[in-house]
């Protein structure tokens, strides 16, 4: 449930109004004036809360819930205890999220931690920087020469924006984030402690005089509506740019190497490592801790399971996993085959009196 100390409490709302807002149906219309004051999980909800149920894994929690009302699909409607008002929705979780986005709009993107509504007197801003009206700069942030920042953007405490960086409108740059050599679009959310635009890992290795550093003269381009999780690092390109496509959502602690191109509306879970010069298509989903070798192409719509190591190109809409990654059907068949070999060998050893 939402904590009042961190987020605003929503106004009390009747079940009739909630059902209408969620495009759902209140099964017992006589309970339309029942008041709900917040949203909560089944096992934490009280009589004033709305919960949701859409997975039999939580059937025990549904049976024991003290919630005042529950969003539920027609399939599971009969499982709701009699004391809980049933709000029928074809997709309960989507309906729940729709309500949450309305009731807790302040939780959708970070606000100023210090209640700033302008530029803090403790910020350092180069005179040549151009900030549109409505930019918020928190204490101890540093903004370099010739930086441009659009209206509605918040620059968090201790963030550093290097020379000539351009940041669009309605963005959020988290506290202690460092940005250089980057062009950033509108409505980009960058969580705290990210590093964007530092030089990539480019060397000529093991020469006569050791490792020779290769100049990294490209940029980082981040398109509109991208979200970047805390602690993520994105290296600038060596010659061509590192590009993050529109609408892509990146989790915490992801490393993106130089010259990587990521398409639109991709999903990257935590602790992924992408080596340099990768090309990733649109609508690609990568599970947590995936590692991908350099100079590969991952086709549109591909999916890779968590903790996989990718050393080959993946075709469009491919479903791959494992180490090294391969099509999931092949991977599963190999796992079954290995388990069968181990089982058969164990049985043979027992028959022969071996441990």
UniProtKB/Swiss-Prot annotation:
GO terms for biological process: lipid A biosynthetic process. GO terms for molecular function: N-acyltransferase activity. NCBIfam families: lipid_A_lpxD, PRK00892.1. Pathway: Bacterial outer membrane biogenesis; LPS lipid A biosynthesis. Catalyzes the N-acylation of UDP-3-O-acylglucosamine using 3-hydroxyacyl-ACP as the acyl donor. Is involved in the biosynthesis of lipid A, a phosphorylated glycolipid that anchors the lipopolysaccharide to the outer membrane of the cell. The lineage of its organism: Bacteria, Pseudomonadati, Pseudomonadota, Alphaproteobacteria, Hyphomicrobiales. Its EC number is 2.3.1.191. The active site is at residue 258. Belongs to the transferase hexapeptide repeat family. LpxD subfamily. This is UDP-3-O-acylglucosamine N-acyltransferase. InterPro entries: Hexapep (IPR001451), Hexapep_transf_CS (IPR018357), LpxD (IPR007691), Trimer_LpxA-like_sf (IPR011004), UDP_GlcNAc_AcTrfase_non-rep (IPR020573). Keywords: Acyltransferase, Lipid A biosynthesis, Lipid biosynthesis, Lipid metabolism, Repeat, Transferase. Homotrimer. It is an enzyme of class 2 (transferase). It catalyses: a UDP-3-O-[(3R)-3-hydroxyacyl]-alpha-D-glucosamine + a (3R)-hydroxyacyl-[ACP] = a UDP-2-N,3-O-bis[(3R)-3-hydroxyacyl]-alpha-D-glucosamine + holo-[ACP] + H(+). GO terms for cellular component: membrane. Gene3D superfamilies: Hexapeptide repeat proteins, MurE/MurF, N-terminal domain. It holds the Pfam family LpxD. It comes from Bradyrhizobium sp. (strain BTAi1 / ATCC BAA-1182).
